[in-house]
């Protein structure tokens, strides 16, 4: 048996999100992905741009980013499209980092981040969002049909 990591899994995520803004992490993202859009996944800017065409976001529209992590992709969407973003993540350190990045990038008025467990009912009214994204995290939800039904409740018609 190998030696177990002394940090519980949430602690490992918190450590990652706590270091997210460091120059080293930015360099790693740039070397791994060829660019740094603040991603915690293999999503590239080209892929995100294709999704943005489908989502048709613009000023006055609102995006919910589920499992937003440190907020990099959501903040890029807000900057490019002019839409408002609400990002939710179960990890409080991720939310703190995302909020800090929003302030640094001058997006705090249009980008809000909350520590919320997205596996249960979400604290938003019906038809609150024009689009919902969840980048590389749907696999973390054991009851995906229930999660999708909740997202359907939150989406505006059309």
Give the label of every model feature segment.
Residues 31-41:
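Class I SAM-dependent methyltransferase Rossmann-like catalytic core
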Residues 131-143:
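A short SAM/SAH-binding and catalytic strip from SAM-dependent methyltransferases
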Residues 145-157:
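A short glycine-rich, Lys/Arg-flanked "PGG" loop and its adjoining helix->strand segment in the class I
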Residues 41-59:
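Conserved alpha-helix/loop element of class I SAM-dependent methyltransferases that forms part
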Residues 1-31:
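N-terminal, positively charged/glycine-rich alpha-helical extensions of SAM-dependent methyltransferases
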Residues 62-66, 70-120:
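Class I SAM-dependent methyltransferase SAM/SAH-binding core
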Residues 120-132:
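A short acidic, Gly/Pro-enriched loop at the edge of an enzyme's catalytic core
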């Amino acid at each position: 048996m190998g030696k177990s990591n002394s940090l519980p899994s949430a602690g490992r995520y918190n450590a990652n999100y706590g270091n997210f803004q460091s120059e080293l992490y930015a360099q790693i993202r740039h070397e791994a992905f060829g660019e740094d859009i603040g991603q915690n996944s293999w999503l590239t800017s080209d892929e995100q741009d294709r999704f943005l065409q489908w989502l048709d976001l613009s000023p006055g529209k609102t995006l919910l980013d589920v499992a937003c992590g440190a907020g990099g992709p959501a903040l890029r969407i807000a900057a490019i499209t002019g839409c408002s973003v609400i990002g939710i993540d179960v990890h409080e350190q991720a939310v703190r980092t995302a909020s800090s990045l929003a302030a640094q990038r001058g997006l705090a008025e249009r980008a809000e981040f909350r520590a919320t467990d997205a596996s249960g009912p979400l604290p938003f009214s019906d038809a609150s969002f024009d689009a919902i994204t969840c980048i590389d995290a749907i696999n973390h939800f054991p009851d995906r049909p229930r999660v999708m039904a909740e997202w359907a409740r939150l989406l505006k018609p059309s």
